[in-house]
Regions:
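Amphipathic alpha-helical interaction surfaces in cytosolic regulatory modules
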Residues: 36-48, 68
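C-terminal structural segments of small proteins and small subunits
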Residues: 63-64, 69-78
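Phosphopantetheine carrier-protein modules
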Residues: 17-36, 52-64
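Thiotemplate assembly-line natural product biosynthesis machinery
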Residues: 1-23, 76-79
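Generic structural marker for isolated residues within well-ordered, non-membrane alpha-helices
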Residues: 11, 28, 46
Length: 80
């Protein structure tokens, strides 16, 4: 899967979970500080990424994912 496709799908998931417009999201967007994700939404994001891409994100690794770009990079490593 191309990284651009991963990026599109990550942004789609972020918009659905956080109920925000695509225009608000960039690779540099921090889930908490820029997009306003609360702790429960952060957990929902991890679950949504796991479901969307068929991967499992361990707790420690999931905590290292702070931005949309981090999520894209993390997922790209798992589905090569």
């Amino acid at each position: 899967m191309e990284k651009s496709e991963i990026q599109e799908r990550v942004i789609k998931v972020v918009c659905q979970v956080l109920n925000i417009d695509k225009e608000m999201v960039s690779l540099d967007s921090n889930f908490v500080f820029d997009l306003g994700a609360e702790s429960t939404q952060s957990v929902q994001l991890v679950g949504a990424f796991e479901e969307e891409f068929g991967i499992e994100m361990e707790s420690e690794a999931a905590l290292s994912v702070q931005t949309v770009g981090d999520a894209v990079d993390f997922i790209a490593k798992y589905i090569k």
